[in-house]
Amino acid sequence: MEDELYLENIDEFVTDQNRIVTYKWLSYTLGVHVNQAKQMLYDYVERKRKENSGAQLHVTYLVAGNLIQNGHTCHKVAVVREDKLEAMKSKLATVTSVHVYSIQKALLKDSGPLYNTDYDIIKANLHNCSKFSAIRCADAVPRTPAEVAQARTLARSSSQTPSDTSAVSTPPLNGHGPTAAKQSSQPPKGIMGMFAAKAASKAQDANKEPKAKEAPSVSAASSKPSAKGNIMNNFFGKAAMNKLKVNSVPGQPKEEKEAVKTSVPATEPESSPNTIVEKPGRKTEPAKIQQKDKKSKMKRMDKSDNEEEREPENQKKKRKRIKQLESDSSDEEDVLASPTLEEEKAPSPPPLVPALKAELEPASTEASAGGKKRKRKRVLKSKMFVDEEEGCMVTEKVYESESCTDSEDDFAKTKPPAVPKQPALPVKKEPKEERKNQKKGAATASRANKQISIMGFCQKK
């Protein structure tokens, strides 16, 4: 009677509930031994197939046996479907056991559903997972409640003993235990304080360096507009040039002082307690740098004085040049009493005002990689161009700026003064009025000849 009830239960699980019934799941559900559950599944399959040969039942089998691989014998346990059972048996050298593992209506593609079924039922009976197992161990005897309590007390005592030994190993000093703890805690704070101080000093140095870089850039930016503004005032006399140079020269020592200040703190964080002996040698380096800066300042002051002496002469020459141009234009107006259309269309000579402005700009100095400074000098050069309408060559003297180094300038100073040209001698000795009269006469003669030839050509036509 009991066997029939069990078979009815299995039929209900498989057909009605459409479950996957494994021997483990059936053992825990019905509370029977695993071997009995396997026998029940086998009987259900045989009985069902005898009653109805067309019944849709898919069975999986648990096969175990010895397998020979590469000359070595191994024991293999596999879960296979019914259609692959004979193939698996043929692979095994000896078959030790064949059991029904599960019964289900659907055809399984893999072993995932079988694993999930067994996992869920074992999780539900985790404390009695080996209750219906066929594997037994004689030494695996459950403990009595007294033995369990005794084991817990031993575990507690073993956990307290390390704390007691640590307390005994730290005796009080002069009857005051807490002071020892405070003293032990102080050194880490000191070490952390040292690291914090180093980090703070590095952060301050990092902040100082950008400020030092910004300061020279701001001063340079402020000096450029002032220089541009003062260039236009150079036409009104020597006083404006002197003010510009006085403003530009003191600005340089400030920048150099800031550079020295930034270089000294940059070297300080690199020094460590292990390199205390090297500090005196490092202190002498800023002193040497200051001496070099002083020497460079003196050289700059001397050069600025020499430039001040040269520039008044250049200004006089410039003013003379402007006056000469004005006088030439007035002579042309006197000679040309009846201008023609062709003469009105003739292009005027290129203006010299931009060239004069370029001449009045202060000589810019650039420091090269080798330490030499480059200057820009003004040189008087003659330029020739062809006047297309008049068909003649015209020469003009224009000041051009050339770059040279300090060494080239010093070499030029040491050379003996070149012999001045013959036309330059009467310029210095003769008074200004005689020079003007001579130039006016020469200009009028040349212009008159040109105009007469052009007028004669027009009259012939």
UniProtKB/Swiss-Prot annotation:
Chief place of localization: cytoplasm
Cysteines joined through disulfide linkages: none
Localization in the cell: Cytoplasm; Nucleus
Compositionally biased residues, Low complexity: 215-228
Biased composition, class Polar residues, residue ranges: 155-172
Compositionally biased region (Basic and acidic residues): 205-214, 279-304, 427-436
A GO biological process held by the record: DNA biosynthetic process
Protein name: DNA polymerase delta subunit 3
Domain note: The PIP-box mediates the interaction with PCNA.
Ranges in a coiled coil: none
Functional summary from the UniProt entry: Accessory component of both the DNA polymerase delta complex and the DNA polymerase zeta complex. As a component of the trimeric and tetrameric DNA polymerase delta complexes (Pol-delta3 and Pol-delta4, respectively), plays a role in high fidelity genome replication, including in lagging strand synthesis, and repair. Required for optimal Pol-delta activity. Stabilizes the Pol-delta complex and plays a major role in Pol-delta stimulation by PCNA. Pol-delta3 and Pol-delta4 are characterized by the absence or the presence of POLD4. They exhibit differences in catalytic activity.
PIP-box (motif): residue ranges: 451-458
